[in-house]
Every structure is written in structure tokens, then in C-alpha cells.
């Protein structure tokens, strides 16, 4: 009874601390951090209590571990992307190498948790080891991963995981068959300080026996030390607030593990006492995946220069990545580096020589924005090297580029062919031809083709948006605004739709409404303030209207500032 009273007191104290911390909470993705505070503190208190157990058999431990792992897998969303499969295979390969030197010969299994917010690793009884994406993302070498895996294997080797199960069974008065209901957080939380330091020592030794450098453990702990200092600092900007999302999940980790400085000192002492010589560390073979993910995250918040830098870093590690090249292309396009974007799109098409209509269209668009006169020449050079059957999309893009270069014959022939075609994709291609006519300043022809295409494919939102731009050019502002009003919501085109409304309202002399629409467009797509970007992609009238609206917005701001200071 006293034990239960003490346990309840600790839990209530933990809950109280979590409730108090809620006052300073920011809106972040769901995290186990708060529960980890509670579990970690509670577990550390309970491990100080004198409790002895009869050690369970290996077979029983393996069975319980398998049941817990199965329950954990069932409660998680499955991520079946190729990148997750690659990391899983890599983690298993490194883990199996390290596990060969483990004292207990258990059926070790290694699992990747693909979340950037899970900056931890943990083990389940019987041989299951989990490593989070957030932790892997912090690593520079395979030796660091080997040290982390060795640490978790040693928690299994020393029966720390099994004893935790027995402790929870006693506290909760559960039959062994009911242990599957245990929250996984009790294993994510750390063990006692002595157990953690022992796992550090023996885990490092395990990694060294496998052929890895002991410096991997030190490097990992040095990263923890840096983050330990950073996670307590207060964010001063929205960007820093965003970067602290993952760091906040570290708080549970630091509360449940020895200080990084203490762990570093212990490993350094171990290296000296064992006389281990320095070994070169191996590159983390999957690091490129995390660099690409960082690049994508920067692209998502329209930090184009940073996204380009990160994508280039990823491609240095692994040059044959279509995903990294796509991030690079979009980042360059967002900065109005259209020739650079075209180069990246071409790399994608060269790496994966299959039909990618959206990449072909983006490649052609980048070429057109870069240089209308020479775009078709470069495109045709690439087409000549395409092996096998050439997708119809190539002909559409080539005809459009030829039109911009002054040759209207290919697009004229293609238009006749498509209007006679029964292919279900024909209306979409006719709509693409309509947009090429818009870029060539033949606005009435653009309206005619796009109207025909939209009538046949009313659900094509981008096509409807293109029609609105063309309607603006022929002074049909009301029709353009109605088209934009009727379009369903799609976050991918909301900014462009807002700018089309702004231009239509501006030209219709509805300036106040135009400036409201301008604000909405800029909030979602800051590229609109780049005159080079706008001029390359839209009509001279649209580009001029955007510049006039930006100037009027600045004039009104200046007027407001002057009025405020009086």
C-alpha cells in the first residue's frame, strides 16, 4: 500500500508539472515529451526502491517483446515511402553487425521510426531496437549509429528492459498476458543513471568490437551537449520557434539520461583505459535522405535559397536523386533562376527516363521563362536522346516552345490533331496549347482553346485559372472574376488565384479590393514581389498591374506612417 501511495504521489506531482507547463506551450506537432517527463521522473524514483525479481526466461522475454512490438506497430501510421524502406534496410544491416557481438544471442530486430520529432532510441524486451528519424538526422557517421544501437542492445543484454516489464507488472498488478497494454513511453524513458552509464560503456565497447570508432559515441554525445544548451534558449523569431519544435521533444530525453558532459568524460576515460586507437569514421550512408527532407522543409516555407543549399548538399552525397533535383528545381524557379531550374528538371528526366508529364511540362516552362528564343532548341536536343516510345506530352511542349520561338506550324497541326482525337487526355493538352498561346500574347486564341478545354474538363483547376488570366487580357474582367469565384478551394493554386483576382479588380478600377487580394497573394507566394519572376511567367499587362499595386500599397503605407507621426 505504501508503494502505491508513493507511486500515486509521484504521478500526481508529474501531472501537476505538465499542467503548469501548458501555459507556455506553442502549437506544435503531437509529441510524447510531456508524458516522457512524467514517466522518466517516475521511473527514476521507482528504480531507487529495493525490489527484486526472479529473472524471466529468454523465451518468455522474447514473447512479451514481440507482443509489445506488434501492438506498437498497430498503433502507428504506416509510412511506405521508398526512403523509409531504404533507412529500415540500412538500420537493420548496421544493427545486425553490432548484434553479432552481443552477449545474449537473441533474435534482434531493428525498427525505424520515421518522425523528425522523435529524437530518441529505445529497446523492448527480447531484442527489438527502435531508432527515431530525429535522432538519425543529427548523425554524421555510421559510427554514431553503431554506438546508439550498441547502447540499446546493452539495455536488453543487461535485462534492463525485462526488469522494467516485471516492475510495471508488479505496480499495475497485471498478468503477463496483459502487458501488451503497457504504454510504449515507459521504454522510451531512460533508466537509472548507473544503468545508462553502463549501457554507454558496454555499448561503445560493442561498437568498437564490431569495427567502429569509439569517437562515434563521443560525437553523438557532443551533439546532445550542443542541443542541451540550445533547447533551453528562448525563440526570438518565428523561424526559431519552428526549429524548437523538435528540440522540445528533447526535454524528456535530457530529464531521463545523464548529462552529455558526464557521458563524454566516461567514454574518453574508457578509450584511454582500453588503449583503443583512433579509427576513421564511416559516412552515414542514408544521410542524403535527411538532407533532402531538410531541403523539402525549407522549400515548404518558401526559403528558396536555403532549400537550394540543402538540396545541393544532398546531391553531393548522392547525385542520382530525382526528389532532391525536384526540390532544387523548384527552389531555383522560386528565385527566378529559370535556366538553373531547367537544368535540374532535365537531370530528373535523364535519371528516370520514363514518362513524367508534369516534369516534362515544368522543364518546358522553365526553358520558356529562361529564354523564349532558344528554349525549343535545347528541348529538341533532349528529345533526341529519349529512348523508346516518346510520350505525347513531348509533342505538346515542343510545339509550345516552337510557337514562342516564332514557328506556329507545329502548334497549328497539333491543335487540329487533338480536336479530332478521341483520347480522354486531349482536352487537357488543348488547354496546355491555350496557355502557350497566352505566353505568345495571342490572348483571344488562348481564350478560345482554354474555354473549349474547360468545358470538357471542368474539374481541371489549373486550366480554369489559366482561362481567367486569358479573360483578363481580353478585358472580360467580370467573367474572369466569376471563373475565379466558382473555382473550388485548392491550396496549391490559392496564391495565384488571389493574384488573378487582384489584377482583375485593379484593371476594373476596384483598387481597394485589389489590394486586399494582393495581400492574400503575397502571404502565400512572395515571388510576386520579384518583378523578374512575374515578367517571365505572365503577360506584360499582368506584370505592370502587379508593379502598380505594389507601388500603391507602399504609397498607402507611407501615407499612414506620416499620419501616425503627426
Placement of each model-derived feature along the sequence:
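A Zn2+-metalloprotease active-site environment signal
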Residues: 2-455, 459-469, 475-502, 508, ...
Amino acid at each position: 500500500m505504501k508503494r502505491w501511495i508513493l507511486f500515486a504521489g509521484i504521478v500526481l506531482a508529474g501531472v501537476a508539472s505538465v499542467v503548469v507547463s501548458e501555459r507556455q506551450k506553442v502549437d506544435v506537432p503531437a509529441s510524447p515529451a510531456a508524458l516522457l517527463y512524467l514517466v522518466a521522473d517516475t521511473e527514476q524514483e521507482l528504480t531507487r526502491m529495493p525490489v527484486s525479481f526472479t529473472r524471466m526466461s529468454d523465451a518468455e522475454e522474447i514473447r512479451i517483446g514481440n507482443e509489445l512490438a506488434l501492438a506498437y506497430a498497430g498503433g502507428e501510421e504506416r509510412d511506405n515511402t521508398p526512403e523509409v524502406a531504404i533507412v529500415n534496410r540500412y538500420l537493420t544491416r548496421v544493427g545486425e553487425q553490432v548484434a553479432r557481438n552481443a552477449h545474449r544471442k537473441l533474435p534482434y530486430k531493428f525498427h525505424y521510426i520515421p518522425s523528425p520529432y522523435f529524437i530518441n532510441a529505445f529497446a523492448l524486451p527480447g531484442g527489438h531496437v527502435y531508432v527515431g528519424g530525429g535522432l538519425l538526422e543529427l548523425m554524421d557517421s555510421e559510427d554514431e549509429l553503431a554506438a546508439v544501437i550498441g547502447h540499446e542492445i546493452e539495455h536488453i543484454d543487461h535485462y534492463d528492459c525485462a526488469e522494467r516489464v516485471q516492475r510495471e507488472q508488479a505496480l499495475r498488478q497485471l498478468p503477463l498476458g496483459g502487458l501488451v497494454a503497457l504504454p510504449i513511453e515507459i521504454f522510451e524513458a531512460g533508466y537509472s543513471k548507473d544503468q545508462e552509464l553502463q549501457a554507454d560503456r558496454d555499448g561503445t565497447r560493442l561498437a568498437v568490437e564490431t569495427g567502429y570508432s569509439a569517437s562515434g559515441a563521443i560525437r553523438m554525445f557532443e551533439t546532445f551537449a550542443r542541443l542541451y544548451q540550445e533547447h533551453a534558449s528562448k525563440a526570438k523569431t518565428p523561424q526559431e520557434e519552428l526549429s524548437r519544435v523538435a528540440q522540445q521533444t528533447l526535454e524528456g530525453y535530457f530529464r531521463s539520461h545523464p548529462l552529455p558532459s558526464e557521458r563524454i568524460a566516461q567514454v574518453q576515460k574508457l578509450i584511454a583505459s582500453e588503449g583503443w586507437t583512433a579509427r576513421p569514421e564511416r559516412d552515414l550512408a542514408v544521410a542524403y535522405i535527411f538532407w533532402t527532407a531538410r531541403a523539402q522543409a525549407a522549400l515548404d516555407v518558401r526559403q528558396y535559397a536555403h532549400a537550394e543549399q540543402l538540396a545541393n548538399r544532398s546531391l553531393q552525397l548522392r547525385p542520382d536523386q530525382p526528389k532532391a533535383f525536384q526540390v532544387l528545381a523548384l527552389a531555383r524557379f522560386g528565385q527566378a533562376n529559370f535556366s538553373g531550374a531547367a537544368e535540374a528538371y532535365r537531370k530528373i528526366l535523364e535519371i528516370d527516363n520514363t514518362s513524367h508529364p508534369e516534369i516534362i511540362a515544368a522543364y518546358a516552362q522553365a526553358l520558356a521563362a529562361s529564354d523564349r528564343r532558344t528554349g525549343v532548341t535545347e528541348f529538341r536536343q533532349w528529345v533526341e536522346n529519349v529512348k523508346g516510345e516518346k510520350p505525347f506530352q513531348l509533342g505538346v511542349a515542343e510545339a509550345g516552345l516552337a510557337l514562342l520561338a516564332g514557328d506556329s506550324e507545329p502548334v497549328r497541326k497539333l491543335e487540329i490533331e487533338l480536336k479530332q482525337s478521341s483520347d480522354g487526355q486531349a482536352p487537357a493538352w488543348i488547354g496546355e496549347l491555350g496557355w502557350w498561346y497566352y505566353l505568345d500574347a495571342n490572348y483571344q486564341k488562348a481564350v478560345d482553346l482554354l474555354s473549349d478545354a474547360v468545358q470538357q474538363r471542368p474539374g481541371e483547376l489549373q486550366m480554369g485559372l489559366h482561362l481567367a488570366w486569358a479573360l483578363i487580357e481580353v478585358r472580360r474582367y467580370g467573367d474572369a472574376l466569376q471563373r475565379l469565384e466558382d473555382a473550388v478551394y485548392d491550396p496549391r493554386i490559392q496564391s495565384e488565384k488571389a493574384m488573378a483576382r487582384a489584377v482583375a479588380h485593379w484593371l476594373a478600377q476596384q483598387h481597394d479590393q485589389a489590394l486586399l487580394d494582393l495581400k492574400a497573394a503575397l502571404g502565400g507566394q512572395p515571388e510576386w514581389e520579384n518583378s523578374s519572376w512575374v515578367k517571365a511567367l505572365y503577360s506584360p499587362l499582368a506584370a505592370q498591374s502587379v508593379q502598380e499595386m505594389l507601388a500603391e500599397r507602399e504609397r498607402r503605407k507611407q501615407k499612414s506612417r506620416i499620419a501616425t507621426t503627426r
